[in-house]
């Protein structure tokens, strides 16, 4: 009897879904890593450098001490009863852990919580949002999630009814959006960021793409904006954000604001403004604009990817719609408690006067300043190579250089049945051990080719990354020169 489950009879939405950040090149890199372990010296490099994903601690970034102290005490509350704890943990970490545990029934961090998250932790997150924006925030609007990704999936599940429902997404975009739209059976409506203007977002292009989609019978439900940008690293100007908010209001679109890199700003002339702050600043009240803001503990200076913490703040939805969002959250029971605690800490870190403040600020500033230096070093290195142009990384954790490939390289890629930038990235991996993501995994203007490279290798390894990359690129260009 034939197998009852085969690729041919799987859900076509799953087959359509792609996620390049952990795709073919990363799988090949993992095989090469195994080869290095079992056959040392068998490859032209001695380690794999994963520049494909925003996973800071996997590349050596250290966690923030205060956050980990509080998590340790919350996970093992009996430590709070021991006298020696006072000499091992800071006083404010001890008091914060006690305060957090007082909001958790039975101090049981291993128990399920309310489906939106523990109320006291949502109160803390709301207080952090209010402090950041200068406008009130309500714990009832907060849904704590296992990172930002489940929140995105929940909103796609809510908004997409069939393939005639569209979501406006930036190109290039983080593949979570194309993947989740495909999984839920919707249509991605692309709008292109302008590489020539530093990955600018033009309202005129948004209008054009919206009108074009509607003319084809697509009911465009929402606009996704990633700020700071992934994979492009730009930080939106405040006036641009005002135009985006007005556009969504005028066109009846839900604004899905991916703001997980809000702490990652590397230029003095830009700063992060949440879309909620912008909406309130232009005069839109609580009920005037449906807005979902996503935040995560995985990025910023904290980089706690494996803890799976995050939240979405939902405003501007009617009570009946909010009930449906809550129902989706309830199906998933709740997010993990460690991630919930960490989300509350990220939004309420130590303040001036707290015992941990000086050490916390030194850790935070050290990480962000180092990331800025790494971004500049890689940007300069890319721009000094033949056939590569790279915009400034204003924020986030990535550079997205354009690779101007020779015609012979494009023909060789076609013969290998690869996208040209995937062909380049695969050769880069096999020659140097450096893992990057082809731009074709994020979307790009047809006829252009890019790679996404994180700025996350530790600062003392950046010179080696640059040296390896330069040697490879020069040899590649010489091999395929027209």
From Swiss-Prot:
Pathway: Photosynthesis; C4 acid pathway; Amino-acid degradation; L-alanine degradation via transaminase pathway; pyruvate from L-alanine: step 1/1. Keywords: Aminotransferase, Pyridoxal phosphate, Transferase. Induction: By light. One of its GO terms (molecular function) is L-alanine:2-oxoglutarate aminotransferase activity. The modification N6-(pyridoxal phosphate)lysine is found at residue 299. Signal peptide: none annotated. Pfam families: Aminotran_1_2. Its EC number is 2.6.1.2. The N-terminus is blocked. Mesophyll and bundle sheath cells. GO terms for biological process: biosynthetic process; L-alanine catabolic process. The keyword GTP-binding does not apply. It is an enzyme of class 2 (transferase). It comes from the Eukaryota. The keyword Cell division does not apply. Its cofactor is pyridoxal 5'-phosphate. It catalyses: L-alanine + 2-oxoglutarate = pyruvate + L-glutamate. Belongs to the class-I pyridoxal-phosphate-dependent aminotransferase family. Alanine aminotransferase subfamily. Homodimer. Transfer of C3 units between the cytosol of mesophyll and bundle sheath cells to maintain a nitrogen-carbon balance in the C4-dicarboxylic pathway. This is Alanine aminotransferase 2. It comes from Panicum miliaceum.
